Amino acid sequence: MCSPASSKILYRNPRFLRVAFLQLHHQQQSGVFCDALLQAEGEAVPAHCCILSACSPFFTERLERERPVQGRKVVLEMGGLKIQTLRKLVDFLYTSEMEVSQEEAQDVLSAARQLRVSELETLQLEGGKLVKAPQGRRLNRECLQPPAAAPISARVVGPKSRPQTPLPVTQTPSPLGAVRLKSLGEEEGAHKKTNLPNADSLSDTQLKKKARVCLTQESRSSPSSQREGPKETKSNPGPTALPSLYPSVDEQLLPRKIRLSRSKPSPHVYTSTPSSILSGPSSMPTAPGRRLWRQRTVSKEAQGVDKQKPGEVRPLQSTPDPSDVGKPAENKKQSPELRAPTSSSVEEGQVGRVKLRKIVNGTCWEVVQEPPLRNTQDSPQILEPSDVEEPSGTLLSSVNEQEIPARIQLCQDSPESPRLQDILLSASHSPDHPMVKSEFGSSPMLTGKESDLNIDCREPYTFDTTLLGQPCEAEQYRITSAAATSELEEIFDFMLCGSDVEPPVGSLESPGAEGCRTPSYHLSETGKNWIEGEEWCLPDMELWPRDLTGLEKEPVSENKEPVEPFSPLVMRSENTESFEPLSPLVMPSEVSREELSLRGSWTPDLEITSSQPLDGQGEKLLHFDSSDPSQRSYNHLSPPCSDWAETGLEVSLGMDDVLCPVPKAVREVSANPEQLDPLPGSSEDEEIDVVDWTVEKKLGPTSVPSVWPDPSSESETEVDILT
């Protein structure tokens, strides 16, 4: 405006826009030229698409997608908005003015943010007034709003990643069968050897037993090592690495219980022989507590019990840690007994709580038997004849006494019990178990604790070895004599090497049924006598480990009469040239000695020799001549289980691979486990009437259901086992 000629005139009239918009507002109010309808709550608000799109990017996007057809109006559904709020907003678009109550203000502001009305979405209600939020806040809000979407995505991602982490956890648990054992094995690294057979033979019932024995076994806590041992038998390469990962999961599961049961046995027996166990399945012995039991279960599986894998059972047989297997089983069986009656407290005649009873018949028996099978695999360790001869008779007798009651109870509990009992008896009779324990670093302690510790550490393996080593052809074990021989040889090799693993017999019989002593039966030649004065004690712990311990503690003199086949449980060790089938619980002493020599704790008294071959003696009865209470106990035990077959003494053998199939007699016994009297609270207090095995001599071949000890061979005193 400097010069009229050159200057340009600039004129501004803010009212015009206002007037124009007011005119548009009138048109909107009257619905003239309106090409859009905004619907909410069933009502519609007319509007101009150009105005809507100019004031809100939200409407711009919507109208671009839904362009109005010529002559028709676009209908936009405004879900979630109140009609009054919508009207207020549209009025503001046309007039830039709005009058609302405080209650409506929040709705209008939220709707403005939803519809992205720029001049309203930045407002906020403060002190009854609508004021523009500071730009800082606005920026923050803007940042927060986009992040709002991000959080959603983040949430999605977060859950995804979380599931991924759990998935690995789930995946890791997926191999729980192996993983549990592994993890347990690592935990029980110290006790691998002790519990190795147990873990393999553990069945569900066995696991329950472990839970029972859990307290005592916890003290023995070396389940990780034991489990590792069985793991190695199953899968040596993987289990070693996995144990660390799985221990928590497995331990949380039954395996923890297994640890408890294993821990007691491992400290004593496996310290000495860790090398052999570790070299083979020892790394898994921690898990072995379970595995050992599973392996025994596998034997039962062979008999019809599927709780344990046959592979596991064989690992027990071949695993150099049969003692481990036996121990965990024993620990489980013993720990209850250890809690209540220790080996010292529980004397020959005493019978402690038998948790084996609680265990499912099939399951319990499976656990006991499977460790023997594993021992067969570990035969090299188990089959040390010198060690077998070395075991102290006293320990064997006491252990035998303790174990025999447990075996009887097993017979009562499950159809397979007869076989188990036979195996237990034979294992208990062999003096090897005590010897084996002494050989182990902890063996001396075990010898001292013969009833308590021997069961855990030495006897389980010793018994396992005997069982593995002495398959009865008459009993027809799955394992051929050649296979059994090879396994037995391996066991002997391991034993010579000083491995902790003992034959399944040890695992079957508790290393030291603490507080329980089972009469040990002498399966040795007629010249040998059972140790008298020892009474059957039913251990609270699982049958196999306890039984082994009882036999171990209880010195048994060799039978004067040749051992005769009683039940399929009797096994013939390769070491023994000929062995007669023993009663389900009895195993040839010679085999025990040779196989169980590794267990220094075995007493020579328990030595069982058979003048006649097992196969040929299927019909003959065992004769026990002994002044030992174990012999007495056994005689007394027989009457309650007068018909081992009837009583269901047959015990499914976890050592099917190692041993020939159990004779029909044993199986019959197992079929009638109920007939057997429950384990007596105290063997001493109660007497077990044992029919003369000689009288019932040749009750029948191994197939004959009932087997009776020979009263002439056994001690004069008879003990009646009361439930």
UniProtKB/Swiss-Prot annotation:
Expressed in testis. It comes from the Eukaryota. The modification Phosphoserine is found at residues 414, 682-683. GO terms for cellular component: nucleus. Signal peptide: none annotated. Residues 303-312, 327-336, 617-626 have a biased composition (Basic and acidic residues). One of its GO terms (biological process) is male meiosis I. Its main location: nucleus. Keywords: Differentiation, Nucleus, Phosphoprotein, Spermatogenesis, Transcription, Transcription regulation. It is found in: Nucleus. The gene is Btbd18. Residues 150-176, 188-350, 370-394, 603-637, 699-723 are annotated as: Disordered. It comes from Mus musculus. Residues 34-102 form the BTB domain. This is BTB/POZ domain-containing protein 18. Disruption phenotype: Mice are viable but show male sterility due to defects in spermatogenesis. Retrotransposons are derepressed due to DNA demethylation. Defects are caused by impaired piRNA biogenesis. InterPro entries: BTB/POZ_dom (IPR000210), BTBD18 (IPR042915), SKP1/BTB/POZ_sf (IPR011333). Residues 162-174, 195-205, 627-636 have a biased composition (Polar residues). It holds the Pfam family BTB. PANTHER family: BTB/POZ DOMAIN-CONTAINING PROTEIN 18, BTB_POZ DOMAIN-CONTAINING PROTEIN 18. Specifically required during spermatogenesis to promote expression of piRNA precursors. The piRNA metabolic process mediates the repression of transposable elements during meiosis by forming complexes composed of piRNAs and Piwi proteins and governs the methylation and subsequent repression of transposons, which is essential for the germline integrity. Acts by facilitating transcription elongation at piRNA loci during pachytene. CDD domains: BTB_POZ_BTBD18 (cd18293). Residues 713-723 have a biased composition (Acidic residues).
